[in-house]
């Protein structure tokens, strides 16, 4: 039995209309060695209350996708394509409008909570600042609302914790603070960039359970960026598999996990340790992700793919092969399974 098979499947959500529509998203960085395309013509949609998992190895473009949507690209970054949020184009918004959007509609949880919290400010002050700045609450009102949100994320002794500094919290508790801060303004979209990477497995499970509960309570859509397929299996409705900035596969989470249609997806799933496996050897994908300055001709996964053929020297188009499913591979699905 795999970790994926034992993970609790996400419950059916009550979705209520298209919230985010990303079309041909492209992120390019100018470097001394040339232009680097970190995200290459990405397409996906997200309904209200739905969770999308974006998975792939390091350097696949997952985080840059999130930074592009949040308007947080580095100074040398350039963005193309479109992203329509609640009927409004959000790419390249003026700074003032972008700040308002991030304050009221879209929030992000970053990978390392210790570097995201100000070590010189008490946690309560950092939470209250959000509400006083963006919601116009008084100090007393912001304090009580912050305590309520810490209670909502299962923070023990929430009122007492308001007076503590970040270094007095464990990693899991700091991440709960970050989740509370992200949800204070009741955003419609929450982007979580590797939110459990720095946590032990027990705390990971607690955080994922918490996100599931909060998703149901607030009907918040979530983009979950991770390399942990167990995390995706436990919370996500849909999965987008990325490699070298491109979509390899896209579809419902259950379909991708139980009937993967791309060699890269199969490789990622095979690399998950199995509880019933004999011996100590772990399966891996041979080789390393490509240098984005020197991508191989055609399919970027070709040099590592066990099913590579001559046709793969041309880039396969991303095509629909079943309802709600896309893949970029020339190999027939039946020949992969």
List the predicted regions and their residue ranges:
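Conserved ABC ATPase "signature" region
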Residues: 88-89, 141-160, 269-270
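A short, flexible loop at the N-terminus of ABC-type nucleotide-binding domains that lies
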Residues: 15-19, 28-41, 72-78, 94-97, ...
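A short, proline-enriched helix->beta-strand linker immediately N-terminal to the Walker B motif
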Residues: 184-188
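P-loop NTP-binding/switch modules centered on Walker-like glycine-rich loops
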Residues: 71-72, 191-195, 199-280
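Short catalytic/signature loops enriched in Gly
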Residues: 13-18, 156-160, 250-337
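ABC ATPase NBD coupling module
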Residues: 76, 90-107, 125, 133, ...
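Conserved ABC transporter NBD signature motif
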Residues: 79-89
